[in-house]
Amino acid sequence: TEIQSAYLLGRRNHFELGGVASHVYMEVILPLLDIDRAEKVWNDIILKHDALHSIFTSNNTQKVLKEFAYYKIECNEGADIKEKIALTRDKLKGKSYNADIWPLFDISVSQLDDNSLLHLSFDFLILDWASIWILLKEFEECYFDGKTIMDNSYDLKEIRTSQLKLKHSSKYLSDKDFWERRIPFLPDAPLLPIKNKIVKNGFERIQLRIDENTWSKIKSNISEIGVTQTSFLVTILALVLNRWSSNSE
């Protein structure tokens, strides 16, 4: 897809801020897991989803592997569990995968006294954020509820073929024509005060949480004027960018 091509380009060191993979690392606390059983469920999930047993070749083609090894989950346990968790976290939180080597993910478990800490690391070449939550839901339903993993109705190739067919539809062509005519009139990117030289490519996630009462009032107010939550937040972002940008548009 177009976004996968962009991710592959961003992994290369051909330009400033390049050489960075699009990647997510997350931790999930679950009731105490039996590692062998959890491993079996994850392997069933890997087998079901083509993306989880795919790689990317040197000519930027996604290849679904027909044969691949049984995935072994790394398990941390013992008296020094805190140190092992820290080591796993440091190893995975900034991991960069070779796109042509399977797997493009890591799954580990740290066994605590009463819970298990699930460590998940995925390259966004194979999954997006919504897909990760689907995988987690599948794992929990299969492991805790005993549900059977159902086969997919479509494979990756069929889905991509359907997407490409949409590009020949009248609606797609009409929308494309509209935006191509708008391009000359779109404003430039905001000129923001930034560092001239980036010493190290890295990321830090900054979060702001709005308390439930305040957010309920916001939702009530914006719904009265027909504004969606997404539009509201994007507008705030635009106002902040405008505040710091040296070009008014």
Language-model features: locations:
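Flexible, P/S/T/G-rich "lid" or insertion loops adjacent to the active sites of thioester-utilizing
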Residues: 10-19, 172-227
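Short amphipathic
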Residues: 25-29, 73-76, 204-211
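Short, intrinsically disordered, charge-balanced linker/junction segments flanking boundaries
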Residues: 245-249
